[in-house]
A protein has these predicted regions:
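Thiamine diphosphate
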Residues: 82-136
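Cofactor-binding active-site loop characterized by glycine-rich and histidine/acidic residues
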Residues: 1-78, 99-102, 106, 110-113
Length: 136
């Protein structure tokens, strides 16, 4: 805390990390709020014709946020270069995922016609392979 070389001189946390020169737009403390930010970046990539891809990582709790559903709809409509990665640890705040969602989380994207795949997040090679297939 308070280190001159730390994030925000040691007075900030990971939600303040950003480096736009590297395409890192930052994070924030609001559940799921990085998802539409990533869509905005994906739309910008399309408009600019850069060939870039926007990626957002979020937890399973964000799957219950309306902003995720809005983002899925817009991303599908506009065929945006967006990769969404849900890190499902089986808990959404204080509730087990099984008591919060009626269906498999990876199937939600199917309602919007978006390619999706569920993989074991503890298998780094399976995650890398799935990500490669998603952006191919």
């Amino acid at each position: 805390m308070g280190r001159a070389g730390g994030i925000c001189q040691g007075r900030g946390g990971s939600m303040h990390v950003a480096d736009t020169s590297l395409g890192i737009l930052g994070a924030n403390g609001i559940v799921g709020a990085g998802i539409p930010i990533a869509l905005g970046s994906a739309i910008a990539q399309s408009v600019l014709g850069s060939g870039g891809l926007a990626v957002s990582f979020f937890g399973d709790g964000a799957m219950a946020e309306g902003v995720l559903h809005e983002t899925l709809n817009m991303a599908a409509l506009w065929k945006s270069p967006l990769l969404l990665v849900c890190e499902n640890n089986g808990w959404s705040e204080f509730s087990p995922t099984s008591r919060q969602f009626a269906a498999r989380l990876d199937a939600l994207a199917a309602a919007f016609g978006i390619v999706h795949e569920g993989v074991d997040g503890n298998d780094v090679l399976a995650v890398a392979d799935a990500a490669a297939r998603a952006v191919a």
